[in-house]
From Swiss-Prot:
UniProt protein name: Large ribosomal subunit protein uL29
Keyword Ribonucleoprotein among UniProt keywords: yes
Chain's gene name: rpmC
Lineage, opening ranks: Bacteria, Pseudomonadati, Campylobacterota, Epsilonproteobacteria, Campylobacterales
Domain of life, source organism: Bacteria
Cystine bridges: none
Organism of provenance: Helicobacter pylori (strain ATCC 700392 / 26695)
């Protein structure tokens, strides 16, 4: 997922996507603790996707203020 894909979405869509990605991150952490996660790098990717979504949300809010 790239920032360019996210910046065209509405705030509501971004917040729904953020909620889904946070749930995915939680599931990955549970799998990691249960030793069922085959690729621990997926946690890093999920965290970065969450950061990208938060950046897009903040950009929408800052552009609407101006």
């Amino acid at each position: 997922m790239k920032y360019t894909e996210l910046k065209d979405k509405s705030i509501k869509e971004l917040e729904e996507l953020l909620h889904a990605k946070k749930a995915e991150l939680f599931e990955l952490r549970v799998k990691l603790k249960a030793m069922q996660l085959s690729n621990p790098n997926e946690i890093k990717k999920a965290r970065r996707n969450i950061a990208r979504i938060n950046t897009a949300i903040n950009a929408h809010y800052s552009s609407s203020v101006e």
